[in-house]
Amino acid sequence: MTVARLMLTDFRSYASATIAAGPGFVVLTGENGAGKTNILEAVSMLGPGRGLRGAALAEMAREGGAGGFAVAAELSDEVRLGTGTTPAAPERRQVRINGAPASATALGEWLSLLWLTPAMDRLFTEGAEGRRRFLDRLVLAIEPGHARHVSRYDAAMRARNKLLAAEGPPDAAWLDALEAQLGQHGQAIAEARARTVTALALRIAAEPDAPFARAALAIEGWVPSRRPLAEELRHGRARDVAAGRTLSGPHRQDLAVSHAAKQQPAARASTGEQKALLLGIVLAHADLVAERRGRRPILLMDEVAAHLDPVRRAALFERLGRSGGQIWLTGTERALFDGIGEATWLAVRAGRVEAA
């Protein structure tokens, strides 16, 4: 399934824009700051979550606009998706599917979305939180229901942490209820992550070493024990009260990535190797999504071509073209995409998008 038409209203730098896209490569070219990434972000908002920038909803509304925004799409099978906010509730996301109100998590039933952005170059060197979000995005593309477990787990954990940090002894009955929720959703999160990492690791292991480095994957940190998580949390209350936060659960996990051939942690690999590792993970995961869900995910690749040498760039275009699916790419000049073949070419200039 692909995006056939994308319509933006008061989204980022766009007062109004309508984009017609073909089923394969969609290439957006323009100067830095022209608004190319804003278009990719709009596409990413057609799934659960806060999109490829992870921004607050209010930040997405156009400066000088009415205060809300709208992103709408017509898919290749005539399904209509829409999301946005109103000026009266700039941080309350609204979603419609074929004109009917729906939840943001329901969007995952229609589209699987994966992306690579320059900000992700720091994925292996920064803290575990970013890698957990990346892992959950990989899981979500295969198991859309994962979003519900993550959001409910996070809400219960925030409530428990607030109780633990309050003065005086926490309400035991309220803790029991929160820990039951954490146990239910935390177990589902941990199991889904483990399934995805196992399947993805096997697929990556079957890939050649070149041109994209093969990654070895594992989950580190908190590991589910035979004791249910709710019970583990109940027994750990005194420790957690002293710490002022919850110390057990899937929010304490990390995605460990290493260079398989060199047996070297990704954090210690060169910048070029890290890019190749990340690209290899995303490409293998796209194949896994296609296998599990029967349709290719939409790939959003922001400035990826500019950071690859000519050999890897050509290999990337060949691999993407052979695999199929819709791939949105951005770059400052058309020459970066020489050899890409048939594509929808779009020129982006200061809040306007035109066929190139």
UniProtKB/Swiss-Prot annotation:
Q: Where in the cell is it found?
A: Cytoplasm
| Keyword hit for DNA-binding | yes
Q: Which residues cross the membrane?
A: none
UniProtKB keywords: ATP-binding, Cytoplasm, DNA damage, DNA repair, DNA replication, DNA-binding, Nucleotide-binding, SOS response
Cellular component, GO, one term: cytoplasm
Q: Which residues bind ATP?
A: G30, E31, N32, G33, A34, G35, K36, T37
Any one GO molecular function term: ATP binding
> Could you tell me which Pfam families the record lists for this protein?
SMC_N
**GO BP terms, alphabetized:** DNA replication; DNA synthesis involved in DNA repair; double-strand break repair; SOS response
* Family listed: Belongs to the RecF family.
HAMAP family under this entry? RecF (MF_00365)
Cited function? The RecF protein is involved in DNA metabolism; it is required for DNA replication and normal SOS inducibility. RecF binds preferentially to single-stranded, linear DNA. It also seems to bind ATP.
Entry protein name: DNA replication and repair protein RecF
What organism is this sequence from? Rhizorhabdus wittichii (strain DSM 6014 / CCUG 31198 / JCM 15750 / NBRC 105917 / EY 4224 / RW1)
